[in-house]
Amino acid sequence: MAETSKDELQLLEQAGAVLAANRGLIDRALTVLKANTLDGDRVSPTKLDDYQLVSYELSLCWAECTAASFLLCHARRLLDEAPDADGVTTSLACLFCAETIASSTARLRARPADFGLTEAEISAATDSAGASFMASQLAADNLAAIGARVLDRDGDLGADLLGEHHTMMRDTFRRFADDVVAPLAEEVHREDLIIPAEILEPLKEMGMFGLSIPETYGGLQEDDKEDTKGMIVVTEELSRGSLGAAGSLIT
């Protein structure tokens, strides 16, 4: 492994350690929430209703931490399968991880007793190495440097490991978003128009509305498995052209 890749791996491992410590706090808070809302061996909706804010904030913390964990895993996989010359994926993954930890910690710290935690426990979850990682990642200079690298790459974030099938889907709907959706987006939003036929008809012809329908029923999805990744790829490309005019259609 090249020296640069070793440095990236070390940074990803550090990010993973800080994230794991933060997730430990969330797990403890979830344990407390579960104990407070159980009725026998099942969660009571009535009791859970008394902990709406806690439930919401823990759900958000967990979702963000899970997303950060997957992004770190993706960056680690890229080091093995498609090393990125300037490490932009690693940088983005570590930055997102730090931002996730910062927002999660802020939620827990705002009302620690409601989560069954203390201020001391929250503070103890981040050691000196973790604090140093957070400070370096969240520094304005770091954000500016990452942004400059993304601009230099014209928005290309490197290999995505989608595979041939999903890459073809992405490229097809990316062209459609650029050539058809984007030129119409401003007028659709400004005039609060319904989605025009110029967008709907080609998408229908491309089979977009059958992406989640099994082939048995006339759709494009294989009968024996779902294609969630394909749905995400198409949604992201159409959303890039316009979230309101095309990105929400597939859902």
Predicted regions and their residues:
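Intrinsic disorder at enzyme termini
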Residues: 1-22, 101-173
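A glycine-rich, basic-preceded beta-loop-alpha segment at the flavin cofactor/substrate interface
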Residues: 1-15, 26-52, 228
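His/Cys-centered metal/cofactor-coordination and adjacent catalytic loops
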Residues: 195-196
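Core structural elements
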Residues: 53-65, 202-207
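C-terminal helix-coil-helix/basic helical segment that borders enzyme active sites and/or dimer interfaces
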Residues: 34-45, 49, 55, 66-118, ...
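N-terminal capping segment at the start of a domain
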Residues: 177-187
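Internal helix-loop-helix
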Residues: 79-82, 162, 205-251
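Non-transmembrane, amphipathic alpha-helical segments
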Residues: 7-21, 46, 50-60, 82-85, ...
